[in-house]
Amino acid sequence: MILFGSTGSIGVNALKLAALKNIPISALACGDNIALLNEQIARFKPKFVAIKDSKNKHLVKHDRVFIGQEGLEQILTECQDKLLFNAIVGFAGLKSTLKAKELGKNIALANKESLVVAGSFLKGVKFLPVDSEHAALKFLLEGKKNIAKLYITASGGAFYRYKIKDLNQVSVKDALKHPNWNMGAKITIDSATMANKLFEIIEAYHLYDFKEIDALIEPRSLVHAMCEFKNGASTAYFSKADMKLAISDAIFEKQDTPILEAVDFSKMPALKFHPISTKKYPIFKLKNTFLKEPNLGVIINAANEVGVYNFLENKSGFLDIAKCIFKALDHFGVPKISSIEEVFEYDFKTREYLRS
């Protein structure tokens, strides 16, 4: 397995599971956490290593250290492994997904932005979704026909129990307190704004070629997806909130190893499902438009990344993230994209516009 994003939350869990099944790790790549990378190198002994910046190369305890995006693509070309586990955060992960597609590799995809911004250019790839909702949908949909509607669930994020009027005063520290999941900073903020759920709906559309998809808030994160059939029956996927289950589903050939303690239905508290309030989560207003116009993905994602970065750096408020997205959409409208090059152009133009 080739693992990009090895020092993040997903990457660390992927390595724990790889060790459980003695899956060889041929390559590791990370950003700036060189201390943890060196621990991983000592443990897993990869043939190739990549880091973001050449200034840290002398700190890496390995003979073959590649640098930046060019280095990632060199590793993909030289390494014979058929599986790329892409856990790079954000738009930065797209080029690696595209290169893996070109080389015919399977992709365990934690980088949902690849599909959000360029799903139409990634047809034919064998994706193994590293997301609790999409792993749940995969299980529920296997061999099934006559599907009427799909649902994925959201916890509501850090501010689910906050009043709308209090959201203009929340801090970064407040936003990073997710009630159920232990995740990286970017996705935790995306959960609080509901951008993450918007992206997951588009990801599900690209993975399963189905547009009748919605999301509901289930505050305990015990139900991850539901499938409604044309005859009125429905099925649901239950598990405790832990990404290791979705990761194991992507990288293990057989699902015969205990990963989590099962949900004890006799002790399970009452479950409630709630519609997502677009007053509280204005980004979610875009769901139907986005499903009709998937090309909007590059604008929405770039604007979201700018907004989240500004919030995390205390340059703007929490509510400004959504404002950033709507400002970009008002300016650019629906882009006409006919090539992957245009995806990169619109990403660049959106960021430039919002920074000007």
Curated annotation (Swiss-Prot):
Enzyme Commission number(s) from the entry: 1.1.1.267
Chain positions recorded as Mn(2+) binding sites: 131, 133, 200
Pathway field: Isoprenoid biosynthesis; isopentenyl diphosphate biosynthesis via DXP pathway; isopentenyl diphosphate from 1-deoxy-D-xylulose 5-phosphate: step 1/6
GO molecular function annotation: 1-deoxy-D-xylulose-5-phosphate reductoisomerase activity; manganese ion binding; NADPH binding
Superkingdom of the source species: Bacteria
Membrane-spanning residues: none
InterPro entries: DXP_reductoisomerase, DXP_reductoisomerase_C, DXP_reductoisomerase_N, DXPR_C, DXPR_C_sf, NAD(P)-bd_dom_sf
Role played: Catalyzes the NADPH-dependent rearrangement and reduction of 1-deoxy-D-xylulose-5-phosphate (DXP) to 2-C-methyl-D-erythritol 4-phosphate (MEP).
Name under which the protein is recorded: 1-deoxy-D-xylulose 5-phosphate reductoisomerase
Protein's organism: Campylobacter jejuni subsp. jejuni serotype O:6 (strain 81116 / NCTC 11828)
